[in-house]
Swiss-Prot record:
Residue stretches spanning the membrane: none
One annotated GO biological process: DNA-templated transcription
Pfam family, one: Fungal_trans
Organism: Aspergillus flavus (strain ATCC 200026 / FGSC A1120 / IAM 13836 / NRRL 3357 / JCM 12722 / SRRC 167)
Disruption phenotype: Does not affect the expression of the leporins cluster.
Record protein name field: Probable transcription factor lepB
Region (Fungal specific transcription factor domain): 52-259
Keyword Heme: no
GO MF: DNA binding; zinc ion binding
UniProt-annotated location(s): Nucleus
Annotated GO CC locations: nucleus
Superkingdom classification of source: Eukaryota
Keyword list, A-Z: Nucleus, Transcription, Transcription regulation
Function of the molecule: Probable transcription factor; part of the gene cluster 23 that mediates the biosynthesis of a family of 2-pyridones known as leporins.
Length: 565
């Protein structure tokens, strides 16, 4: 035991045969013996491989680390363990969160079989490392003043929890906890005048250290603003106001270039780097925040709002699309022109689709209230058109991913960010079919919804979130007497417990009965459409009461939003 954290080094397969069963039996890994946090790490060769996979397959989703520094931290950690020296809990938590996120995203096609026997084993390890990371973070919050590594670990862990659960209370608590720790470390005034900072904060930071803090801060802030326009209980609210921070944007530079140029230098966004996606995401988030500031509260009378304001807000999304560098555009000519860039930065392919999925999901969300009110004002046809175009763009991204990424596409389709937008896009198509029967061929529109549901169905084999989304859609549609698939064929999937401690950090003293067991979140093979009579199922759409008020449809959308959290 070192600094209240007991660490054992075990090969993955050995750990699953011993440590995993002990955790399952005890109900809490931290309750065994007298240690505060009891964890296991893979041997150094497996750890090195996992970090390499993280650098290639995960870090571009949230580029908040300086990988050369993390590699050195891991080297130091294993050296300290071998010599029995004191270890820092924040370093253990960061390494565990990296391993968890890597294990979750691995597939046999990305080399996952080098450490894990199969995909389910990798998900089990992601589950176990996530819970251990929560234990260590809780211990670190009680025994240390906090560090940038604690924040980084919390962000990465929230990514894993988000993919396991969705917008649950645990995910939101982790995100809020990361922001709280960041404010405690004065990250929100990182670039204020040094003589106005209390104590020896920013002046002692290295240029690279300050740049990483900017990445961390703006990742959290952009996530906060994007979620404000994403549905769910947090819709219409955000935690960080731009007037309450003094933090420069991160620079558009690769890690290897951070110490090659002066601290003010940044490449233009037309030049691709590992940070270009992050900076575009920040721009998109700022549009979302501006929309939230300009919109009336969700409970307002939408019939009395200034529709011209909505159009101007929507046109900001359109302007953002026009401003995208060529390697982030979706049209075939731009993608063909970007092949050399994709060869240099392969992650741009995935980033492009995540950015567009997020963009179109938020644009659809902005126009969604008017989708159900087209009959009230002919001008609202503009919002219906935009809403449907955005929804169909999200759904068509799957085909583009299949084309550009071939067999690797399935691994990224199961990412919660993509699934969430795909789910809501499908709901938009369903609502429009029910409300606007003159909007085109009914049979074609029915088929596109069935095809979209099949994508969610196919993702269920490896994504607990896809199963929850499909079940939520079926349950809500059944409640409103709208049926596409037999709802009883979709298995019940329990989310991770949302219990949190007094600090806002998820309580690590939870029994594993409150946690999703990986064997439970991977449902057995089934086909909800296999025995379905499509004509009979769709008759429920045709017979839907057309006299439902717009408010009733608002409640339906709200129900769909609430069921994903």
């Amino acid at each position: 035991m070192s600094n209240g954290v007991s660490v054992r080094v075990l090969a993955v397969q050995q750990a699953l045969e011993t440590e995993f069963s002990l955790v399952e039996a005890s109900g809490n890994p931290s309750s065994v013996g007298s240690c505060v946090a009891r964890v296991w790490l893979p041997p150094k060769n497996e750890a090195t491989w996992l970090l390499k996979r993280y650098a290639e397959d995960v870090t571009y989703l949230h580029h908040i680390l300086h990988l050369p520094s993390v590699r050195q931290q891991m080297e130091d950690l294993y050296k300290q363990l071998s010599l029995g020296l004191r270890i820092e809990p924040c370093h253990v938590a960061l390494i565990l969160s990296i391993f968890a996120s890597t294990a979750y995203t691995l597939t046999p096609l990305t080399g996952g079989d080098a450490v894990f026997t199969n995909e389910q084993t990798a998900v089990k390890c992601a589950f176990l490392w996530s819970k251990m990371a929560l234990d260590v973070l809780e211990h670190s919050s009680r025994s240390t003043p906090g560090s940038i590594e604690d924040i980084q670990a919390t962000i990465i862990l929230s990514f894993v929890i988000f993919n396991f659960e969705g917008f649950t209370m645990r995910f939101r608590a982790l995100s809020a906890s990361a922001l709280t720790m960041a404010r405690d470390l004065s990250l929100h005034r990182l670039d204020a005048r040094p003589d106005r900072l209390p104590g020896p904060h920013a002046p002692l930071d290295s240029d690279i250290g300050r740049e990483i803090k900017r990445r961390v801060w703006w990742h959290m802030v952009s996530t906060d603003w994007i979620l404000a326009l994403s549905g769910g209980p947090q819709e219409g609210t955000y935690l960080m106001h731009p007037a309450h921070m003094r933090v420069n944007y991160p620079r558009n530079l690769d890690d290897r270039d951070l110490d090659r140029y002066n601290p003010q230098y940044s490449r233009p966004l037309s030049q691709p780097t590992a940070m270009t996606y992050t900076l575009l995401r920040i721009q998109l988030a700022d549009i979302c925040r501006s929309a939230i500031d300009a919109l009336p509260p969700p409970f307002s009378d939408w019939g009395e709002v200034n529709y011209d304001r909505f159009i101007s807000l929507d046109q900001r999304f359109e302007a953002f699309i026009r401003s995208l560098p060529v390697f982030f555009r979706l049209d075939e000519a731009s993608r063909h022109q970007s092949r050399d860039v994709e060869h240099q930065y392969p992650q741009i392919i995935v980033q492009r689709y995540i950015l567009w999925s997020t963009l179109q999901g938020r644009r659809s969300k902005l126009n969604q209230p008017f989708l159900t009110r087209v009959s009230m004002n002919p001008r609202y046809q503009y919002s219906r058109k935009v809403c449907l175009q955005s929804a169909r763009c999200v759904i068509e991204l799957k085909a583009l991913m299949d084309h550009d990424m071939a067999s690797l596409a399935s691994a990224h389709v199961r990412l919660a960010t993509f699934l969430h937008n795909y789910f809501l896009a499908t709901a938009v198509l369903v609502m429009d079919l029910c409300l606007n029967k003159e909007g085109g061929s009914s049979e074609d529109r029915r088929q596109e919804i069935v095809d979209a549901c099949r994508v969610l169905q196919e993702a269920e084999a490896t994504s607990p979130m896809a199963s929850r989304f499909l079940k939520s859609l079926m349950d809500i549609l059944q409640k409103y007497q709208i049926q596409v698939l037999p709802a009883t064929t979709v298995p019940d999937v329990r989310p991770l417990s949302a219990n949190t401690g007094a600090s806002g950090v998820p309580d690590p003293n939870l029994s594993d009965r409150d946690l999703v067991n990986p064997s439970q979140i991977l449902p057995s093979t089934y086909d909800p459409l296999e025995n379905a009579n499509i004509d009979d199922l769709w008759q429920n759409f045709i017979n839907l009461d057309q006299n439902c008020s717009p408010g009733s449809w608002d409640h339906l959308f709200s129900a769909l939003d609430s069921r994903i959290v």
